[in-house]
Amino acid sequence: TGRPLSTVIPTEGRGAVRVEARPIAEIQNAASRYMKERGIDAGDGYDVTGYPELNKDRARLVAAAYQQMKDDPTNPAVRRAYEALIEETLGQLRALDKTGIELDFLAPNTPYPYGESPAMGYGDIVTNKRLVTFPTRSGYGTGTTADDFEVANNPLLRNVGRVGTMDDATANDAFRVVHDAYGHFGPGNPFFRSKGEERAFLEHRRMFSDDARPAMASETTGQNSYLNYGPDEIFNTTASGETTKYAPQKIGIMPDWATDPTGMPDGAELRRLQKIVNEWRKANG
């Protein structure tokens, strides 16, 4: 199907403009240097140069797997995966800092500059070498903020010090920055619906170790599959960023097949998950 060549981005005072969705060299070079330093093989067997057609049936099964995933922050395997995710996220952030791109966070009571479309961040980087991120403390899921969760039960809410313009950022703030940079904007993927989010998962997944990938998958393809193909699929198809019904925040890891971009469940697990999907379809009419 090929990667889209352009996207329409709203602009202040000029309506909307169509821009070519090219990779951003500074970010791509930072990603390559990081992987080389870490000894990570960028060619892990999955083609991320194109824009593969999304398998919606599989995405619905991933959504069901995310729903069934236990919120299990004290599980040693879960803890190890999230600790690896955080450590590697901070390493990726240091690599991004060297690009000279200004990493800003939205100040309280300030209009979000990408409110009309998150794709506006692409133009901001290309034109102004700036990326603005919505802080975790201002929104973390549907109708909740970071203050609604206990840090002891969510390692992503741990304070990691200064990130960009924020002195007391959380690990989740750092992950939001690097995922937008390395998953979306750097590869020329300023798309934030289901296909763009899955491609961001494929792009950014390459930069993580096997230890971190299960947690990274829960935070990306797990949550995004639930958002786009879970129980609120019909509502979210036309919802704005403010009205979208997001996935519940959980600290856990999905089955191995769900973290593998081409994996599929089978046997009793497939039947159990398909039953959940069928119930969603029935409820949505």
Positions of PLM-derived features:
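Core of folded catalytic or high-affinity ligand/protein-binding domains
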Residues: I86-L90, K98, L103-G241, Y246, ...
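Charge-dense, extended regions
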Residues: G230-N284
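Compositionally biased regions
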Residues: G2-R3, T7-V8, E12-R14, Y226, ...
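Short, flexible coil/linker elements and helix-boundary hinge sites characteristic
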Residues: G2, G39, G100, N236, ...
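Glycine-rich short-loop/terminal segments
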Residues: G2-R162
